[in-house]
Design a protein with these regions (language model features):
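Bacterial Sec-dependent N-terminal signal peptides
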Residues: 1-36, 41
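Surface-exposed acidic loop/strand-edge motifs in secreted or periplasmic proteins
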Residues: 39-134, 181-257
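Short, surface-exposed coil-to-beta transition loops
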Residues: 93-95, 154-159, 273-280
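Residue-level signal for glycine
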Residues: 101-107, 167, 271-273
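Short, solvent-exposed aromatic-acidic interface loops
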Residues: 112-117, 175-178, 295-304
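Acidic, glycine-rich flexible loop segments
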Residues: 117-158, 163-164, 241-271
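Alpha-helical oligomerization segments
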Residues: 159-178
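Short beta-strand edge/turn micro-motifs at domain boundaries
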Residues: 168-170, 274-312
């Protein structure tokens, strides 16, 4: 069931694209899921001059500056020549440049993404790339969310960019909508749980503290403790031996059964086999629509919910 008021609030929270241009204000428009610790340090980042007149565009570019632990992160949307007209207004399809430091040393300098490099075959003219203002950060990785949307609509795709401390970059597909079209926070949270958990586990040297932070964000205390002991070779949540992070491209989250507070997820392995799991959800205290993952059990294709209006 799509809840209209909640849906609008969720889209505003997830796809918001307006942030103060003032550098002092920028520090207050960031709310990391793990509290930031500011430290005194020499200036690592010197901002490049941008002489573009942004007043001609419908939406102003976002800038993010934040410090978390020994991470220092700077992100800048900027105009790189891509624009289009929508409803008589000019929209820029901004690119984003990242400068990321860890322990006082550069990890990514001038790393650039745009809608073509991030969306690949899903690139569509007339859509614009929006940068999420809140980053999720662990000791080993910085996760940046993007909404790729048709202006003034909820016709959007989502991507997550993982910038890892070892210098590797990974791109993940997520969604705010279930396979049946339900838009709800539980869908987003399950996608992000799988994305962050799998990314952390698949690093060359997984970090226990990073994994714990991710699990504590999205799971109940008891289930987080269970998953903390798991690996990619054998994992209760993932359900396949030697899970490959690229399999997440096919991940689907299905409509929640409100009687049991469970939903089915599935993905396709490289050998073509479909894997189904039933995710158990527990309502967060003092909330109406927010859930934590409390468990997982095996499922089959027969457990999938019926598609609305007889769709297949």
């Amino acid at each position: 069931m799509i809840r209209p008021i909640y849906t609008l609030a969720l889209l505003f929270f997830v796809l918001t694209t307006v942030c103060a241009r003032n550098k002092k204000d920028d520090a207050h428009c960031i709310g990391n899921i793990f509290p930031a610790t500011k430290t005194d340090s020499t200036q690592l980042y010197i901002e490049e001059e941008d002489k573009t007149d942004y007043s001609k565009f419908a939406i102003q570019p976002i800038r993010v500056d934040t410090i978390w632990g020994d991470w220092e992160i700077h992100a800048r949307q900027f105009y790189d020549g891509k624009k289009f007209t929508y409803d008589k207004t000019t929209h820029a399809d901004y690119a984003v440049r990242f400068n990321v430091f860890k322990g006082g040393k550069p990890v990514f300098k001038g790393y650039k993404v745009n809608s073509k490099s991030l969306m690949g075959p899903n690139y569509t003219k007339g859509f614009e790339l929006g940068l999420f203002e809140q980053f999720e950060i662990t000791p080993t990785s910085v996760y940046i969310g993007f909404g790729y949307c048709e202006p003034e609509t909820d016709n959007c795709l989502e991507r997550v960019l993982a910038l890892n401390a070892d210098g590797t970059v990974r791109k993940y597909e997520t969604s705010i909508a279930s396979a049946e079209g339900d838009i709800d926070m539980y869908v987003t949270d399950i996608y992000w749980l799988y994305t962050l958990y799998v990314n952390e586990l698949s690093l060359a040297t997984p970090n226990a503290a990073s994994i714990q932070k991710v699990l504590n964000k999205y799971c109940t205390t008891d289930f987080a403790k269970q998953l903390q002991r798991e690996t990619l070779k054998k994992n209760l949540l993932l359900g396949s031996d030697q899970f490959d992070y690229q399999w997440l491209r096919s991940l689907e989250v299905h409509l929640m059964d409100e009687k049991t507070n469970t939903c089915i997820v599935n993905y396709k392995r490289a050998d073509g086999k479909m894997v189904y799991k039933r995710i158990h959800l527990q309502l967060k205290p003092e909330t109406e629509y927010e859930y934590l993952v409390s468990g997982v059990s095996d499922a089959t294709e027969k457990d999938l919910p019926a598609m609305p209006n007889g769709e297949e």
